């Protein structure tokens, strides 16, 4: 969390929108909980809320930490640094061209309304359930332990180049 907070501060100092690649957001929250001082007693949801509070926008494939069979997200903070940086304003400060509206028009003409993004109701409900499940500490702990078990097994079997400790979604060799 410290690196996210400090990176956001630097980006904002130079008026650069701070964007997160949030494909593994829940996994990152788990490692923050386990490794950073002051987070041990916080829930994954509380950590996620803080983590996303520092960004001006994020992208994520929701097939990963969303447990969905499809879907992704591109999100921007309303009237945040991204909006200020890429919208055009008149001399009096009123809005001339709103980048949010431009993106919404592109979204609707390409993928469907921004409230569903061409996803079926079933897929949206599966995604909602998956996002909820990813906030379960026991699930995340089991996932990390499975990766460590596999990585340590490879290492003990003499596989060269196993990266230890393993992450939370795969084993690197």
List the predicted regions and their residue ranges.
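Conserved PLP-binding catalytic core of the aspartate aminotransferase-like
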Residues: 160-173
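Conserved PLP-enzyme active-site core in the AAT-like
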Residues: 1-162
């Amino acid at each position: 969390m410290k690196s996210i907070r400090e990176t956001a501060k630097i980006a904002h100092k130079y008026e650069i929108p701070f964007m997160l690649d949030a494909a593994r957001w829940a996994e990152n929250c788990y490692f923050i909980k386990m490794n950073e001082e002051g987070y041990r007693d916080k829930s994954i949801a509380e950590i996620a809320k803080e983590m996303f509070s520092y960004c001006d926008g994020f992208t994520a494939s929701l097939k990963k930490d969303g447990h969905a069979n499809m879907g992704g997200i591109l999100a921007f903070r309303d009237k945040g640094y991204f909006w200020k940086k890429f919208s055009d304003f008149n001399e009096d400060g009123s809005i001339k061209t709103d980048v949010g509206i431009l993106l919404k028009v592109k979204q609707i003409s390409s993928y469907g309304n921004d409230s569903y993004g061409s996803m079926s109701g079933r897929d949206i409900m599966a995604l909602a359930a998956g996002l909820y499940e990813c906030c379960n500490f026991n699930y995340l702990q089991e996932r990390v332990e499975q990766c460590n078990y596999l990585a340590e097994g490879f290492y003990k079997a003499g596989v060269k180049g196993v990266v230890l400790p393993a992450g939370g979604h795969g084993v690197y060799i």
